[in-house]
Amino acid sequence: MARNIVVEEIVRTPVEMQQVELVERKGIGHPDSIADGIAEAVSRALCREYIRRYGVILHHNTDQVEVVGGRAYPRFGGGEVVKPIYILLSGRAVELVDQELFPVHEVAIKAAKNYLKNAIRHLDVENHVIIDSRIGQGSVDLVSVFNKARENPIPLANDTSFGVGYAPLSETERLVLETEKLLNSEKFKKEYPAVGEDIKVMGLRRGNEIDLTIAAAIVDSEVATPKEYLEVKDKIKEAVEELAKEITSRKVNIYVNTADDPERGIYYITVTGTSAEAGDDGSVGRGNRVNGLITPNRHMSMEAAAGKNPVSHVGKIYNILAMLIAEDIAKTLPVEEVYVRILSQIGKPIDQPLVASIQVIPKPGHSVKEFEKDAYSIADEWLANITKVQKMILEDKISVF
């Protein structure tokens, strides 16, 4: 059965040629990214435990996580958290399997704690955080699950929804993405342990000049004085300047912690490395899209991918798939830009979308007719192998924020 794939030329100014471009990334320690990370960690942990016990992923969606900011008194040399961060795990998961209870809450809380321990080094998970699992219950008869799987080897869409992806990344997008990844890399943290994980990078390109505004939480126990704090800021700037030279020949202006006011004793210091300790709240889906960026110059989906089940939830699967299709087309065909939109219809097989729209801006001297069939084939092959996306997610080969 032929798939509903439409390839067409789109008439628009490529992002690199637009006068103004805005790009944002919320780093792994940002409250919104903490919510995304926990939601996804819980989903993946449930998937693995369901498979271990029953040989199949049972229905769940854990994409409702709220991070409620705590209260802290940071000070140079080391402060304290006086009110813990409250994290609410919500959503739905099968808890009753053939009249036997599955430990949803235990699996979820353990996954959340492990994620936080690995993601935010200076956060004391036992004392700085309260994790409350209110994940709703569901029940299932395994025989009916296996029978349904035999009848429908390709999962049926659980919603009418769309996913969006594009490629390639612009220089500004790459710079914003790689800046946060550098500052939160294991190597950089070993060299500069004072740099916390709550790093937000905002990029603005005007013509051929890029402004990068970086908000980086500095850990108070790692800096004894304002002088040491300012030295860390300088190191951040120097590292990003070197990175920028590798990515772009455009002029790049770098600003770090611009709200600081040394004369009034105002510095961006934290006890834990995240602003969640100081009243900043976070929610799933309020941050980065599946490519790790927030890009108002591009098509975007408003779906929160983190925490959704990787079997049939098109809000997750189609956003990832659209990105993968776009990346393959951009790598292999003569296009300036490609945008992919995939729309499901509830109850229909996820490999048969209502439409897969591929919009391209051909490179100068090329036309869509030259590679229309190739673009179609790339999308068709990914859709035919759509269950690969689930495998990539469970093997931690894909991040969704």
From Swiss-Prot:
Q: Which residues bind ATP?
A: G136, Q137, G138, S139, V140, D141
Q: In which pathway does it act?
A: Amino-acid biosynthesis; S-adenosyl-L-methionine biosynthesis; S-adenosyl-L-methionine from L-methionine: step 1/1
Matches recorded under InterPro entries: AdoMet_synthase_2_family (IPR027790), AdoMet_synthase_3 (IPR042544), S-AdoMet_synthetase_arc (IPR002795)
Q: Which cofactor does it need?
A: Mg(2+)
Q: Which UniProt keywords apply?
A: ATP-binding, Magnesium, Nucleotide-binding, One-carbon metabolism, Transferase
Q: Does the keyword ATP-binding apply?
A: yes
Under which EC number(s) is this enzyme classified?
2.5.1.6
Biological process annotations from GO:
one-carbon metabolic process; S-adenosylmethionine biosynthetic process
Pfam families for this protein: AdoMet_Synthase
Q: Does the keyword Transferase apply?
A: yes
GO-annotated molecular function: ATP binding; magnesium ion binding; methionine adenosyltransferase activity
Reactions mediated catalytically? L-methionine + ATP + H2O = S-adenosyl-L-methionine + phosphate + diphosphate
The UniProt entry's sequence similarity note says: Belongs to the AdoMet synthase 2 family.
Protein purpose: Catalyzes the formation of S-adenosylmethionine from methionine and ATP.
Q: What is this protein called?
A: S-adenosylmethionine synthase
The organism is Pyrococcus furiosus (strain ATCC 43587 / DSM 3638 / JCM 8422 / Vc1)
Q: Which gene encodes it?
A: mat
